[in-house]
Amino acid sequence: ARNIEKLKDLKKEIKAHLIKCDVTNIKSVTNLFKKTDKIVGAPNLVIYNPSKSLGGNIIDLDPKKAYEAINITCYGGFLVAQQAAKRMLKKKRGSIFFTGATASVKGFPKSSVFAMGKFGLRGLAQSLARELHPQNIHIGHFIIDGGIGRENYGSYKTIHPDSIAKIYLEFHYQDKSAWSWETELRTSVEKF
């Protein structure tokens, strides 16, 4: 995260290490992995979650903000995957997962920038799956089709974060004879 202050409670809860990182900066991403190497070694699983949404009419969008949003949503995924793959290829195993959205497969009005970033991230994941699966690196892309939250859990209006985490782990442990590269997650009441 760029701002690790908001994660301090989570750090205590799950006994995690916090490392500040700007995913759009090559040096920052390289430093993240070098620090991780020293703390816990080469990762077995890397999940890329960052994204930035920018909505609005195409004629009103600020090009600089659009550039930043696409860099965070997509280019950062490339930088993180590159560093993760370098380490995993040496170990001859690992998983790299990307968190997508409905916008990964369907553009909506006034969401062109978000769709560009998520479409690009999905394309990256699909290409990497074809490149790295034969080398025992599992690539996954997860289309999160709905809001995420703990509230309204019984009504299934949002996807519970613990349920998402469970699916990610199940995907990580898929048998090599039945690997998939993409899955969609939505509540039972979400229209699609």
Which residues fall in each region the model found?
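Helix N-cap/beta-alpha junction loops of NAD(P)-dependent oxidoreductase domains
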Residues: S51-N57, V105-F108
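C-terminal helical subdomain
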Residues: P134-F192
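A short, exposed helix-loop element centered on a Lys and neighboring polar residues
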Residues: A81-Q82, Q126
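Catalytic loop of short-chain dehydrogenase/reductase
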Residues: S95-G120, Q126, R130-H133, I143, ...
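A glycine-rich helix->loop->beta "capping" turn
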Residues: I14, K35-Y48, L54
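Catalytic Tyr-X3-Lys loop
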Residues: N44, K52, I59-F78, F97, ...
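Active-site loop of short-chain dehydrogenase/reductase
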Residues: A42-P43, N57, M88-A101, P134-I137
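The beta1-alpha1 cofactor-binding region of Rossmann-like NAD(H)/NADP(H)-dependent oxidoreductases
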Residues: I4-E5, K20-L32, P63
